[in-house]
C-alpha cells in the first residue's frame, strides 16, 4: 500500500495524505457481522464528561472481529479485504468450510484466495494462521496476542504492529515488543502469525481539523489560554508562561510524569521499553 496525496484545490487539502485503498476488494460488508455501537462521546452514565476531547464522529457500524481464533482444525479461505472504520488496519473476511464467515485482522501479505487455519499446533508458519505460543518457533513474528488463555487477543492489534517470540521458559514464552519491551506471556495463549498490515498508516498526515472531527476527536484548548478558574496554567498578562511544571486541569503532573500504577502483572515485564 502506498501513501497517496491530493490535489490542493483548498489550502488545507495541500498537506493531507492518506493510505491507498487499492487493496480493498469488498463491495459490501456481511450484515450479520455488523452491529451499531452507542456513541458515548466521552460521557458517563450521568452524562458528565469523563474523557475530554471526544465526540461521536462520523456515523459507522462496528465489525465483529474474531480475536479468539479458537475455530480449530477448520480451514478458511480469504473472501475479501475490507476497510474497518473502528481501526487503522484492514480486516479480512474468512469463509470457512463449514459455511461460517468471520472477520480477522489482516496480516501483512495475506490476500484474497489465501487459506488460513487455527490450531493448537502443527500449522505452517505463514501469515494468518494462529496457534498456541508454546508451539510457535522461536524467532517468529506474531500479532493479536492473548494475555489470558481463551479471552481473545489484546496485544499487537494496530496497523504495522508486531512482536517477536524470543524464547520459552516452562509455562511462559518471552516476547519482544516493537517498543523494545521484553515481556513474558503464558504459553497457552493464542497468537496469530505475521505482522499487522497497513503499515504505512504511521506516515499519514491528518492535515486539517475537520478530518479529526470525523474521527471523533475534538479540539484541545491549551491551559495557558484559559482563565485561572479553569486551569492551573491560566491567567497572566499576554502570552505569559505558567511558571510551574506542566500539570493537568486538576493539578496532577503531566507531560512525561509517570502515572502507571503498580499491578501484579509487572513481574512479567523483564525489561522496560527503550526510548526512541
Curated annotation (Swiss-Prot):
Keywords: Ribonucleoprotein, Ribosomal protein, RNA-binding, rRNA-binding. One of its GO terms (cellular component) is large ribosomal subunit. The keyword Signal does not apply. It holds the Pfam family Ribosomal_L2. InterPro entries: NA-bd_OB-fold, Rib_uL2_dom2, Ribosomal_uL2, Ribosomal_uL2_bac/org-type, Ribosomal_uL2_C, Ribosomal_uL2_CS, Ribosomal_uL2_dom3, Ribosomal_uL2_RNA-bd_dom. One of its GO terms (molecular function) is transferase activity. Transmembrane segments: none annotated. It comes from the Bacteria. SMART domains: Ribosomal_L2 (SM01383), Ribosomal_L2_C (SM01382). One of its GO terms (biological process) is cytoplasmic translation. Residues 230-240 have a biased composition (Basic and acidic residues). Residues 255-276 have a biased composition (Basic residues). Residues 208-276 are annotated as: Disordered. Part of the 50S ribosomal subunit. Forms a bridge to the 30S subunit in the 70S ribosome. HAMAP family: Ribosomal_uL2_B (MF_01320_B). Belongs to the universal ribosomal protein uL2 family. One of the primary rRNA binding proteins. Required for association of the 30S and 50S subunits to form the 70S ribosome, for tRNA binding and peptide bond formation. It has been suggested to have peptidyltransferase activity; this is somewhat controversial. Makes several contacts with the 16S rRNA in the 70S ribosome. This is Large ribosomal subunit protein uL2. It comes from Campylobacter lari (strain RM2100 / D67 / ATCC BAA-1060).
